[in-house]
Amino acid sequence: MLSYISAAFQSPSPDEGVQQRPPRYVGEDTTPTSRREILGWYSYGIAAEVFAVCGVGSFLPLTLEQLARERGTLQTSRLPCVGPSAGNSTNATEHGQCVVPVFGLEINTASFAMYTFSLAVLIQALTLISFSALADYENNRKTLLMVFGFAGALASMLFVFIAPPLFVIGSILVVVGVTCLGSSFVVLNSYLPVLVANDPSLQEGKADDGTEMSSFDRDEGDSEGNPWGKDHTDNDSLDGLQPSDQPQSSLEGGMGTKAPLSSSPELQLSTKISSRGIGLGYCAAVFVQIISIIMLLTLSKTKLAKVSATLPMRFVLLLVGIWWGAFTLVTRNLLKTRPGPRLDTVSTKGTGRWRAWLRLVGFAWKSLWETVKVVSKLREVLIFLVAWFLLSDAMATVSGTAILFARTELKLSTPLIGLLSITATLSGMTGAFLWPQVSRYFRLQPSHTIILCIALFEMIPLYGLLAYIPFIKNWGVFGLQQPWEIFPLAIVHGVVSGGLASYCRSFFGLLIPPGSEAAFYALYAATDKGSSFIGPAIVGGIVDATGQIRSGFFFMAILIVLPIPLVWMVNADKGRREGLAMAETLGKSHGGPAEDAQEAEGLLARE
């Protein structure tokens, strides 16, 4: 492992400056992808995934809710929610819900956190779409990655200064952090096609055994110092989507003009790099989460916790921000700029440059709309996107609600919530590897596997609703009445989420017209981000009306089950045939294929 860390401080190899293929545009960097670059790409995943898991998934919603709670009052008695004069009862119905004034309105403190994250996701979606074309030009790709990375890290670090009277500013920092997180990941993924395209193995041919080897694998060789060992999971993510006795070509519509997606050397290499990056990011997140729990346990015994219950969590967010910024700096040193074509060949200075940027923003939205018009003619794709719209909203709603429910209803301590996050994260990693095996063993169709995941996901809100049954409520256990009950549900949530994330994306890929992957994945990502703000906002409104988060489980139970009939209706074979026919139509309308043309993928296509 030390050999990999030391790469950050080594000088680039002289061979890295040698152009290996003719450039497609003036200024294109076609030098071979080096081990340093791959490590730089991994490094940012290690940096930002920590904020995604430890910040967004754990301590940010808790900190925001607690900051508001320390400024809030009980709605009925008007006693402070926190302090010596606060009510001793933990039952919110006895003294009324804890509310805080925000812009003249009284909002439940848990709803305040949910509204904030809902707004953050909405702004993130608008940002992703607007910047989708800009990053493909000049040095914008690396510039945007650094801007988003350092700005997000700074937003996390600044939480250490956010005292309860400044809780509204804390919500602004959440919006900035979440927006930078999502945007930076998409920019990072936009590097992947460039790194793969310039990999020496794809330019020089195949290895002696006929298999593709990336430059990173060449550097590793058979050395015993390889910290990740041999990679036996190089198959594309489409593997396991079909029963073992069903040929992959059955989804190709019999065209036979192109190799199956999973046999593409570029896609195999891209999948290998991506899967390793995700794994390293999750490992880093678990590592920092463990450190965070130790910090919380230590700081809770000091005078800091007596000043404000948020201080230990704010110091954890400081640590998370420092980690994010430090590894972003490593990425800055290792990752090449890899510039795109010039933004404006006529005028690149002054107002002309700004006009060019605005045109690209407009182009991004226009491209998205053009894709929507094409999708409207593809019935199977349209049905699946509607299902994905509902499903992604349900996943975001359950994730955001669970943390606040654990804190406000189950009274879980902050370290235990950190442990809850670790449980869900490790379960998600397990689920990503488990579901392909389950699918092969039971010979499940892709849609059946997705439906099975959704059915298991439905267990979470249904289990929480058991507490409304009188005799179960009298037992005082089951139906999420005891803190320990949420941990088995966290395992279910993690395993199901890991399967849904990978299977839905791969299944959608089977329906895409060949040659339009970038545009359709842009719409897929926009559908994800564009829907994920609705559910949390609705649950926030329900909590405001009822004073209890548990009442939001009714809405979540309905939201989760809605995609099932839609997924069942999708015919993958028919969708693939429609996609191939549409690809032929689009090819004719654009004057035939243009294999040598530059692919304008856009940011959203790589998420």
Curated annotation (Swiss-Prot):
Residues covered by region (Disordered): 9-31, 203-263, 585-607
Protein's UniProt keywords contain Transmembrane helix: yes
Family: Belongs to the ATG22 family.
Alphabetically ordered keywords of this record: Amino-acid transport, Autophagy, Glycoprotein, Membrane, Transmembrane, Transmembrane helix, Transport, Vacuole
GO terms for biological process, alphabetical: amino acid transmembrane export from vacuole; autophagy
Main location: membrane
Its membrane topology: Multi-pass membrane protein
Gene Ontology cellular-component terms listed: vacuolar membrane
Localization terms from the record: Vacuole membrane
Record's protein name: Autophagy-related protein 22-2
PANTHER family: AUTOPHAGY-RELATED PROTEIN 22, AUTOPHAGY-RELATED PROTEIN 22-2
Glycosylation-annotated residues: N88, N91, N235
General function of this protein: Vacuolar effluxer which mediate the efflux of amino acids resulting from autophagic degradation. The release of autophagic amino acids allows the maintenance of protein synthesis and viability during nitrogen starvation.
Sequence intervals crossing the membrane: 44-64, 111-131, 143-160, 161-178, 277-297, 310-330, 381-401, 415-435, 450-470, 484-504, 521-543, 552-572
Domain of life of the source: Eukaryota
